Swiss-Prot record:
This is Large ribosomal subunit protein uL15. InterPro entries: Ribosomal_uL15 (IPR030878), Ribosomal_uL15/eL18 (IPR021131), Ribosomal_uL15/eL18_sf (IPR036227), Ribosomal_uL15_bac-type (IPR005749), Ribosomal_uL15_CS (IPR001196). It comes from the Bacteria. Residues 21-35 have a biased composition (Gly residues). It comes from Methylocella silvestris (strain DSM 15510 / CIP 108128 / LMG 27833 / NCIMB 13906 / BL2). Part of the 50S ribosomal subunit. Residues 1-14 have a biased composition (Polar residues). Residues 1-35 are annotated as: Disordered. Belongs to the universal ribosomal protein uL15 family. GO terms for biological process: translation. GO terms for molecular function: rRNA binding; structural constituent of ribosome. Binds to the 23S rRNA. GO terms for cellular component: cytosolic large ribosomal subunit.
């Protein structure tokens, strides 16, 4: 077999239908578009329609859900805290809180509190008052001689119920 002997498989390509060439052709007058309406006009494209093939937005599975009770923590690694201590942005003598981290520029918004994660090395002896911490972070903080206090979240205020 040579390159000049390659042929398409029989029936793999259909010849183009010439439309609008008289009613005897079977595709005259309205050219297979039916009568009037949006689909008979030019320039129309139905969003997401793939010619009858199952469209992409229906082929892909639905995933995940929104948890209305989920907490959104500011996560900070021990390595970033040590860099801030070395740069003098965190006072070693003071307790590290949500407010002090905002003041030092390590976090921008309060969100639902701060979670300390154990990536990196902490050499400074720091005491923390934060919402959450990983086990490795707690172990590293205590190994460096520091302390950590996990703050309890205040319960949500009850909404006014209709008593009528």
């Amino acid at each position: 077999m040579k390159l000049n002997e390659i042929q398409d498989n029989p029936g793999s390509s259909k010849s183009r239908m010439r439309v609008g060439r008289g009613i005897g052709s079977g595709k005259g007058k309205t050219c297979g578009r039916g009568v009037k309406g949006q689909k008979a006009r030019t320039g129309v494209a139905i969003k997401g329609f793939e010619g009858g093939q199952m469209p992409l937005h229906r082929r892909l599975p639905k995933r995940g859900f929104y948890n209305p009770f989920g907490l959104d923590y500011n996560e900070i690694n021990l390595g970033r805290l040590q860099e801030a201590v070395d740069a003098g942005r965190i006072d070693v003598a003071a307790v590290v809180t949500n407010e002090s981290l905002i003041a030092s520029g390590l976090i921008s918004k309060p969100r639902d509190g701060v979670k300390i994660l154990g990536v990196g090395e902490l050499k400074a002896k720091l005491s923390f008052q934060v919402a959450a911490a990983s086990k490795s972070a707690v172990a590293a903080i205590e190994a460096a001689g520091g302390s950590i206090e996990l703050l309890k979240r205040a319960p949500e205020a009850p909404t006014a119920s209709a008593e009528a």
